[in-house]
């Protein structure tokens, strides 16, 4: 019922919009089978728009990519692009719930002309996407709840429609209207079947028909359409209407205003066939009667006698109009039985509706009680949620505080550690600076030591050369000493020979002396010669002794020199070999040794060089003292 009130003013504007869309659909050039080709729509769209816009348009009109578009999909796509797809869904849902097939015995069930005058109800077609908003607001304003009014029993036709009648009327009017608009032209409209055979031209006469005839017609139609056992698609709507009849609470959420109902009638005259219009009028009369029944006795059951008296009174009142009095008087007698049956049937219906109302009232009270329990439960749950939120907030605050404390502690530890690391980094930087300075100094010292080592190597080479020269000189001296020995041996042999000669000469002189002593004069001269010979012999003996001593001294000196040369040669050879080994490992020592070790090695090398100088000086002095001729350079 709320859905009917939500778009109570929409079908008139919706009808005009759909008719205009029908004109556009026809202009676009549909095929004889009632479908519009997608290629045709794309070709027309490219004349007035861009490629992307045309693609979006085709996607909206043909979402399933079928290649063809019927009028229903065409309308749905246009409504979707305008932002009114929800309204179209509501209309289609009502259409699917209340549409009935067209009765086959109605030959004039065709769609009327599509020419529509905009001055029918004074409304203009809005051009914005929300073009039903004003009608909906007007319908909601006019559909406010109204209390039961004191109406005259003799004028039931003038009573306003109730919520049940408005819902039913809207459903009966909108469903065939929207169903017929979306069908092709070669198919009949989807209309509610009716058993009346009067044409639209007899509308003025039908308005004067008595309430009994109208009720009789409704009864015949109700036997076909609204029987409880009839599988009518509108049973749900009728059930809601009947359930609201017995309710003491007046609801007019689905009430259709008389202005809008007049607009519906004026609009639908161009669409519905005459029989459908007749059926709608009868339904409106039934709605008026039910509203009157509800207004006069909302909470009690109406007896059949009272209801028959009311109908008779209304019939007598309406039969006093003009030339139709005789016609109605004849029809009353023939329809008493039918009216009684219909009244009984309606009484049963009202009883059922009252029972349904009581049941719904009990259900409402039960639902209210359950709702109250649920409200209390919701309140309890809300309190529990609040308690849980409070507990969670406290726990969160406690956890946040603990995390803040831990974070502060970690920050302090981090700051302390950073300070220590910064201090350590500064110390390492200072040590690195000192080491760089030390490395530079050591490099300079290493370069100096390399230069000193080079000088020492040069001096060692010079000393080696000098030693080699000394060895050569020593060999020459040994050769010369050997020659001196040979010469001394020769001289000694010569001296021995000389001594032998002198001895023989001495013996000869002694013999000559003896010979000379024998004569007298010759004796004195021989004595002088003997004396001279003896003196010469003594001198020679002294010379021999001296030569022997010198020879002995020379031998001792030679032996001493040989021993000294041999010992010095061995010692010097050892020192030279040790120095050469140290010189060879000097580079490795420089690479691996420390500064103190390098200084000690340098001092040792200098001491070795000093000793070598002393040794060479001693050898030279010894040679100069004993045999300076050795140092003479002979060419």
Curated annotation (Swiss-Prot):
Presence of keyword Coiled coil: yes
Keyword Transmembrane (UniProt): no
Membrane disposition: Peripheral membrane protein
Cellular location(s): Recycling endosome membrane; Cleavage furrow; Midbody; Cytoplasmic vesicle
Residue span of region Disordered: 147-176, 216-258
Function in brief: Acts as a regulator of endocytic traffic by participating in membrane delivery. Required for the abscission step in cytokinesis, possibly by acting as an 'address tag' delivering recycling endosome membranes to the cleavage furrow during late cytokinesis. May play a role in differentiation during retinal development, in a Rab11-independent manner.
Protein name per the record: Rab11 family-interacting protein 4
Taxonomic lineage from the root: Eukaryota, Metazoa, Chordata, Craniata, Vertebrata
